[in-house]
Amino acid sequence: MQHAAVPDSLVHEWAESIVGDQYPVPDRILHFTEILVQDYLSQEMCDNRPPRGAYDLFATEGGTAAMCYIFDSLQENFLLNKGDGIVLMVPAFTPYIEIPQLSRYQFRVTKIHANRMNNEGMHLWQYSDEDIDRLKSPKIKALFVTNPSNPPSYTLSPDTMARIVSIVRNDNPNLMIITDDVYGTFSPHFRSFMAEIPYNTLCG
């Protein structure tokens, strides 16, 4: 992808980024950097088939920090409240399991497990349709998923992805999906939920 830029403005932004002599106000990714990140996400998270429009981006100092900000922001903006029901797809990165249990959140956590097996008794690291269908309940406010999974490193099957997308579109349109796609770049032709249902998705 190609973008036009005023050379002096581009070099000025890069120089300020390297020197670190000021913070952007309001907090945000710098202009030209954001353009590059948008293209990168379209390529790596959307298989070069992004939805129309641009993503709202916010950079953090790391993945765990991002999770803390996400939980706090959802609660401070009354999108999630104490006692709300959330679904956690496991296995998952440990902070996803521990953070919702803190007294400041007290979410009602339902874990669904990637326990499907093949005919030889080997783990497929995939989820049953019955468990996925639990997301149809309006009592479930948010779904937390690591895709590809951590530590098994398996992506959600196309059937499971399609089933969740269908549930959001037809059964639970207010369901928020918080997806950690940090290992998506290792999966050829990977497509995140942010590519399929961007309005409902927060991707970290």
Annotated model-derived regions:
Residues 177-178:
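Residue-level marker for buried hydrophobic side chains located in beta-strands
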Residues 1-2:
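N-terminal low-complexity, Ser/Thr- and acidic-residue-enriched intrinsically disordered segments
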Residues 181:
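Walker B catalytic acidic pair
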